[in-house]
Curated annotation (Swiss-Prot):
It comes from Podophyllum peltatum. Its EC number is 1.14.19.72. The chain crosses the membrane at residues 6-26. Cytochrome P450 involved in the biosynthesis of etoposide, a chemotherapeutic compound of the topoisomerase inhibitor family. Catalyzes the conversion of matairesinol to pluviatolide. Pathway: Aromatic compound metabolism; phenylpropanoid biosynthesis. This is Pluviatolide synthase. Heme binds at C432. It is found in: Membrane.
Amino acid sequence: MEMETSVLGLSSTLIIALAITVIFLLKAKSSSAIKWPPGPKTLPIIGNLHQLGGDELHIVLAKLARVHGAIMTIWMAKKPVIVVSDVNSVWEVLVSKSSDYAARDAAEISKIVSASSHSINTSDSGPYWQTLRRGLTHGPLGPLNISAQIPIQQRDMQRVIREMQQDAAANGGVIKPLDHLKRSSTRLVSRLIFGDTFDNDPYNDSMHEVVQDLNRFGGIALLEQAFSFAKYLPSYKRGVKEFHIHKRKIDDLVRPVVASSNPPSNSYLGFLQSQNYSEEIIIACIFELYLLAMDSSASTATWALAFMIRDQQVQEKLYQDIKRVIGDEVGLVKAEDLSKMHYLQAVVKETMRMKPIAPLAIPHKTAIDTSLMGTKVPKGTCVMVNLYALHHDESVWAKPYTFMPERFLQREDGKSVTEQAFLPFGAGMRICGGMEVGKLQFSLALANLVNAFKWTSAAEGKLPDMSDELQFITVMKTPLEARIVPRNP
């Protein structure tokens, strides 16, 4: 009897597996009629998934592109994904045919925290998206509001420096700078959302924790997009459960603050409420801004510090550039001085080139039947833009894997090509709406941290690990610990 039950169970498993295989083959047959760009050889059922392990995905795809071309097709199981990696193909997708590629390929699991794809970065282009983006970029992220934020952000930098000094004093001179910078970014985002006068450290600390926790589950979305039947896997079900748990945390955290706020018209909440959006959409849009903005400038500034710990000459050049502008004045580097610091701007650009915060951008999807460099691309095709590969293209950049800020001080041959090959915020219709405030936050933080402290390794002879970890953004796989010494004790 037990043997019969076992055989029946095995037979059922085989039947299910066979059914999945048949469905896969039928769907694959329809895809095979399309002439996709070339790519690595595939295996049945899994496509190219076996080739995407090891390094982080953007690095793996860059290596594959060197073999199979700057426009290649990667099969995530039965799903074709076109990956573009050079200047011409990236520019066509992002700029020349921006509207053709402006749809989004959002994972189902992401809809849990995005009000069913009603946030800026998850919604397709169209009237709703245009209204939402215009409200963000003309209001809280507009030039007037950013200018109004500058004195507040400068005072916040004084707080960051003071808290770093206290942290170092309590820990033998060693700190984790990312923690301090993230808290500063969270405070900035909160002011953009709720208005300049918003000041609520318990709320900001709680939001920081929620974002940190949710970042750990970024890979679940990729799993779902790779396998249509991933929803039946235990790991995916656990991920969905975690997303729902965090959705409730977000609601419980944001809802009372929204209810008690009287936001100014130039705040994000003020705009969202003026459109009479549902509470679910308002909370989703607010959380998205934290998710995308909280870590980006903080992580990029931390990468820059790590590069300068590894190359003390770069750090000294930057310090001298700062002193050239502000002289012997002790105190804060002001935002108005940043544009005069040419080497600072070079370090900022080189850091964003080496470690783009979103190395694969956010996956695009064709909104219509279109073409790419002469090859037909059907509507609904997922297209990934590998900004990491673009920023490390040896045909454009000299010694692309070496940190050399000087490359941005003296133009290389082919000026226009170099400019088109440097796209840390993307380009075209879907360019990052927070580009200007992000650059300001990064530059202001870096200038002040190098002006206030000399940065060295936490342990003598142990340089920072520069390995990437791709979550929703690129972070340091090993969080930076550094020893700081005040320059003006």
